[in-house]
């Protein structure tokens, strides 16, 4: 009840993410209908998806304390499950180990805008030679972003260019990379689970569940046009 600010009812169904999530969603709606004695006319239909545990993601940056940390924040903020983080120049074994872990997505950063160019180009070449099979978001030095993307795309890798996660020293700009991660989530993860079909039944574009939690936390902290926020807060997502 948006006017009263209350949760009226809840329904649930077993997960069917390994087959078709529409089956589980229909079961949850049937459970809700049983509890309420009928389904109401919904003003809004909104959804999020955990994608069977979230996006398995690896980040590669220039310096661990700087661009690698910025890449890590972008990954976690988008609802990704960070399974590895690398800094400095990748060795052949590093790149092969990344490929062997079969991440869903890789965020490649490195260098401020106009700063170090060599490392991100080097790392792109090593990843290309290791035959990385997942999409790569290039979010490093904008001066060589196109060249970096060309190295990867010439190896058959799906590449997206985003704004630099650290355009200036100690200045973070992670939101564009987060948006790119979410786009990959929608395009490559949820389509495999039948969520693209389910999306037609909702008003809003699907997003990763952890990203929805973060948006909710941001709303709580900052408030809306009509309601003030709570201010600084800590959210524990269990």
Which residue ranges define each predicted feature?
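Ser/Thr-glycine-rich phosphate-binding loops at phosphate-binding pockets of nucleotides
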Residues: 1, 238
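Short glycine-aspartate micro-motif
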Residues: 233-237
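Nucleotide/phosphate-binding catalytic cleft detector across ATP-hydrolyzing
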Residues: 3-232
């Amino acid at each position: 009840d948006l006017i009263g600010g209350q949760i009226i009812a809840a329904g649930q169904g077993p997960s069917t993410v390994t087959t078709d999530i529409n089956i589980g969603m229909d079961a949850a709606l049937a459970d809700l209908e049983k509890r309420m004695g009928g389904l109401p006319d919904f003003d809004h239909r909104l959804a999020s998806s955990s994608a069977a545990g979230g996006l398995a993601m690896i980040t590669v940056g220039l310096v661990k304390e700087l661009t690698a940390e910025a890449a890590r924040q972008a990954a976690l903020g988008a609802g990704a499950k960070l399974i590895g983080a690398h800094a400095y120049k990748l060795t052949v074994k590093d790149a092969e180990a990344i490929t062997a872990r079969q991440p869903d997505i890789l965020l490649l950063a490195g260098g401020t805008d106009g700063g170090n160019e060599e490392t991100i180009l080097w790392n792109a070449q090593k990843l290309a030679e290791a035959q990385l099979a997942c999409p790569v978001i290039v979010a490093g030095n904008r001066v060589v972003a196109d060249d970096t993307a060309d190295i990867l795309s010439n190896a058959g890798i799906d590449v997206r260019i985003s704004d630099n996660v650290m355009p200036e020293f100690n200045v973070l700009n992670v939101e564009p990379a987060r948006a790119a991660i979410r786009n990959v989530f929608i395009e490559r993860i949820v389509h495999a689970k039948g969520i693209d079909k389910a999306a037609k039944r909702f008003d809003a574009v699907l997003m990763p569940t952890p990203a929805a939690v973060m948006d909710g936390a941001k709303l709580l902290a900052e408030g809306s046009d009509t309601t003030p926020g709570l201010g600084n807060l800590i959210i524990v997502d269990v």
